[in-house]
A protein has these predicted regions:
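Conserved GNAT acetyl-CoA-binding A-motif
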Residues: 57, 64-75
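C-terminal "cap" of GNAT-fold acetyltransferases
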Residues: 70-73, 77-84, 89-93, 100-119
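Conserved amphipathic alpha-helical interaction elements at protein-protein interfaces in regulatory
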Residues: 49, 62-66, 93
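Non-catalytic, surface-exposed connector residues within folded enzymatic/regulatory domains
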Residues: 32, 50-51, 108
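Conserved phosphate-binding and hydrolysis motifs of nucleotide-dependent enzymes
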Residues: 14, 18, 51-53, 91
């Protein structure tokens, strides 16, 4: 639907329980043409614990490689410790922290930035 985005869905028994998006760089951004942004990786709370997030992440990496990208970038709230553990276990490197990344229920939350070089 949107040329700059790729949607990856995770299913169990034919039902969609999670998804992620790959956002390609804009066409006029030649300097970043080798990198794609992973966004909105989500698994429904009642479907967690079955490895679906890892499967979606790996499918996103596979699709990024197929599209010719060499790097995946992502960012995540510091409070999302399960997601951070997944990214680190899958080889993503944290390269920075934003001290005022998000506001959740009136609280300021830090955010972390990660990247992974695709082989």
């Amino acid at each position: 639907l949107v040329p700059e985005r790729e949607l990856i869905v995770g299913r169990m028994d034919g039902v969609i329980y999670g998804a992620a998006q790959l956002q390609k760089p804009s066409r006029n951004n030649e300097a970043q043409s080798f990198a794609v942004q992973l966004m909105h990786l989500f698994v429904a709370p009642y479907a967690r614990g079955h490895g679906l997030a890892r499967m979606i992440l790996r499918k996103a990496e596979e699709r990024a490689r197929a599209l010719g990208f060499h790097v995946i970038n992502l960012d995540v709230r510091a409070s999302q410790t399960s997601a951070i553990a997944l990214y680190e276990a899958e080889g993503y490197q944290r390269w920075g922290t934003h001290p005022v990344y998000a506001r959740v229920k009136g609280q300021i939350i830090q955010g972390h930035y990660f990247y992974k070089a695709l082989k």
